[in-house]
């Protein structure tokens, strides 16, 4: 398992589109057992519904515990591929397949790093055996690309009950925009999605006094939402952003006033806000658009997590130093991009993210350079050595 490409190909060959596992965790579990890990499979799901499989693995006993988290589920392949999306082919020096970058390749690199750490020299003979005093844990879910209800957050709850703890955690998401060594994620913005339905009364456009047009209030609400800047950013976060995503009336007739109109928008917010504070902010503007009438609208809010930050320090320094030693580049520390399961882990232990290049993730012909698989494996190995020599 010291070769990341072999394991990455085996994982990519599993069509594990959320919530299907398709054998991916079996492949990973076999590799980890061979390295001395104790593995526990943790299927979770709603009563009577489909269950999602997860894996927790640990090697070692007392002492500091280094955690690694990731996911084996992938988004649907879609169309436009030049190679089979689950063929796991190597083409022009790159592994092509859904999940190669996001993030089966990263998982394979971490397993290869552990194998090299504990099993002796690499092909160049430059790595000496280093069986750490302490432990290594992996938290791998099959529910990250989907609703994320029965994955990492449920495994963390199980860990608390079982007395399993990590001293820190590295999430292997593809954090690098263009090249390996670009970026370490030390936090993420929060996310809040709102669906507002403005209620009115249908009627003929020639007789507006007999109807109540909700589109006019929707227009007012849109203006209120966009009229002010949420903030100007903070030391580690860019400014919060509100983006309209949908206006739906369901009215094909130009001479009919609709009975309702629905607006959807998302706010990606920094650490100056919380889901609770922004929910109140949205509700106040809905009330204002409806002249204080609570019966004039319905509001559904989906809060996937607040902004969080692991301040620059021992964990990010450990990753950056290892990356610079391998690539010659010291990564930028960033909180940009979308959400990840790090939002759940942050309440368990310090967490940071670093993985492969994400330029092609979720796209046709998703790919990762074979050379990057090798380089990331060496970065992860150096991170492990650094941690066990001087735990963060």
Curated annotation (Swiss-Prot):
InterPro entries found in the cross-reference section: Bact_exopeptidase_dim_dom, DapE_proteobac, Peptidase_M20, Peptidase_M20_dimer, Peptidase_M20A
UniProt KW DNA repair keyword: no
Family indicated by similarity: Belongs to the peptidase M20A family. DapE subfamily.
List of residues binding Zn(2+) 1: 71, 102, 173
Enzyme Commission number(s) from the entry: 3.5.1.18
Cofactor section: Zn(2+); Co(2+)
Top-level taxon: Bacteria
Cited Pfam families: M20_dimer, Peptidase_M20
Active site, renumbered: 73, 144 (proton acceptor)
Catalytic activity of the protein: N-succinyl-(2S,6S)-2,6-diaminopimelate + H2O = (2S,6S)-2,6-diaminopimelate + succinate
Protein name per the record: Succinyl-diaminopimelate desuccinylase
Keywords associated with the record: Amino-acid biosynthesis, Cobalt, Diaminopimelate biosynthesis, Hydrolase, Lysine biosynthesis, Metal-binding, Zinc
Details of cofactor binding: Binds 2 Zn(2+) or Co(2+) ions per subunit.
Gene that this polypeptide is encoded by: dapE
GO biological process: diaminopimelate biosynthetic process; L-arginine biosynthetic process; lysine biosynthetic process via diaminopimelate
Binding site for Zn(2+) 2: 102, 145, 362
């Amino acid at each position: 398992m010291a070769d990341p490409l072999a394991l990455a190909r085996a994982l990519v060959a599993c069509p594990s589109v959320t919530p299907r596992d398709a054998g991916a965790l079996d492949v990973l579990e076999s590799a980890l057992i061979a390295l001395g890990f104790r593995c526990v499979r943790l299927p979770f799901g709603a009563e009577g519904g489909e269950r999602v499989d997860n894996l927790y693995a640990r090697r070692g006993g007392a002492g500091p515990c280094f955690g690694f988290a990731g996911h084996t589920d992938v988004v649907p392949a879609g169309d436009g591929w030049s190679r089979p999306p689950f063929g796991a082919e190597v083409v022009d020096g790159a592994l092509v397949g859904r999940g190669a970058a996001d993030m089966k390749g990263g998982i394979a690199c971490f397993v290869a790093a552990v194998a090299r750490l504990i099993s002796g020299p690499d092909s160049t003979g430059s790595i000496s055996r280093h069986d750490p005093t302490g432990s290594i844990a992996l938290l791998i879910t099959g529910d990250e690309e989907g609703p994320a209800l029965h994955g990492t957050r449920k495994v963390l709850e199980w860990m608390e009950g079982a007395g399993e703890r990590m001293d820190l955690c590295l999430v292997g998401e593809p954090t690098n925009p263009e090249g390996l060594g670009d970026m370490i994620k030390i936090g993420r913005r929060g996310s809040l999605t709102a669906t507002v339905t403005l209620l009115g009364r249908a009627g003929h456009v020639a007789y507006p006094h007999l109807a109540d047009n909700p589109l006019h209030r929707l227009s007012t609400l849109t203006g209120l939402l966009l009229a002010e800047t949420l903030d100007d950013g903070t030391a580690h976060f860019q400014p919060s952003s509100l983006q309209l995503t949908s206006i739906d009336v369901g009215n094909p007739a130009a001479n009919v006033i609709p009975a309702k109109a629905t607006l959807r928008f998302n706010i990606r917010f920094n650490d100056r806000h919380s889901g609770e504070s922004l929910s109140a902010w949205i509700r106040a503007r809905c009330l204002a658009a409806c002249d204080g009438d609570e019966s004039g609208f319905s509001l559904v809010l989906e809060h996937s997590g607040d902004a969080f930050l692991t301040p620059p320090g021992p964990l990010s320094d450990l990753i950056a130093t290892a990356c610079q030693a391998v690539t010659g580049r010291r990564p930028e520390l960033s909180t940009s991009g979308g959400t990840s399961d790090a939002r759940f882990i942050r309440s368990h232990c310090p967490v940071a993210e670093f993985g492969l290049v994400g330029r092609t993730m979720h796209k046709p012909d998703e790919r990762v350079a074979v050379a990057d698989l090798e380089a990331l494996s060496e970065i992860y190995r150096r991170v492990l050595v650094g941690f066990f020599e001087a735990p963060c």
